[in-house]
Amino acid sequence: MQGIWEAIRDFANPCSVLTKSPLLLRDLPLMLQIAERTSSSACLSIPTLDEKAWRATEPHTPNPRARLEAVAELNRAGIPTGVLIAPLMPGINDAPHQVEPLLEAAIAAGATSIGGIALHLRGEVKGLFMQWLSEQRPDLLARYEQLYRRGAYAPVAERKRLAAMVRRGAPGPLRRISLSRAREDHPGPVIELCDAPDPVQQRLF
């Protein structure tokens, strides 16, 4: 990874990195060198602060609170760093009492952006996830089979519901910040939901 950072620095190539690992802090000196020449930013994905939900769905990943500490440290160092609440999983980590503390913690860590991504189930992952549900959360299996019956993405209505939950969970002042204004004079984190495009029928000719 060091060689990649060095190449980005040497060519002054703007960069942004998305990761779930606080080990990104090891590369902070090189990121700061890049920031002296061009734009450099980061984003850490954090699905939840609910330890039970985290251990059930991401048992071998870094502790979410360690990721938040990395967000805070990167921002203190001058690297704009946001938080991506991902994946958002209906019935697993999307309850208000799960989302709101994470939003508050992200803001406290100085997150420059806060977004969310609904769970995607592509390829073989879909079967594996459904099997996991049947073993660990059989109460949710029928719901997920219905939500993902047409493909890898949840229906638009479900994605909009999750987007609204992220927005509602933000503190009052942030609810009134439009995305355009937030990007212009940066009064606080940008609250948004990163979404997948609706499927479009492709043409052969």
List the model feature ranges, each with a label.
Residues 132-145, 149-205:
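C-terminal accessory extensions appended to soluble enzyme cores
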Residues 1-143, 147, 151, 155:
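Conserved AdoMet/S-adenosylmethionine-binding subsite of the radical SAM
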